[in-house]
Amino acid sequence: DLLHGSQFCHAGALMRRDVLEALGGYSESKDTLRVEDYDLWVRMYAAGYRGFNTQEILYSMRDDRNAISRRTFQSRINESKVILRAGKAFGFQSFSYAQACIPVLKGFCPTWLYKYLHGKRLSKK
């Protein structure tokens, strides 16, 4: 499901140091700016490592009022690039082209509409 976005909440993630070192740590490329964690998960799975989420909720997280403004158009393009790399790594290249359009389309969405839709999505969880 990494083509649909990061499946892990990075703030609470635990990982083995040797795995992080084997992957070369976080990418410092400008193409992964603001999506470094997502890129790391893709590389981790592509290298054969696995992860999981506990079923128990251990903490709550919230976005502050500036969270949406930090989601720049460039960070959405970077997310699309990671999706395309994931598609290639996992053999779903044709599907990843469609998935990679979603972050870019969100970038064209008016802020008020994005806030509304984001709130609706979160209220379903």
Protein language model regions, located:
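Short, aromatic-rich membrane-interface segments at the entry and exit
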Residues: S94-S96
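TPR/TPR-like alpha-solenoid helical repeat scaffolds
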Residues: A98-F108
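Terminal low-complexity segments of carbohydrate-biosynthetic enzymes
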Residues: K106-K125
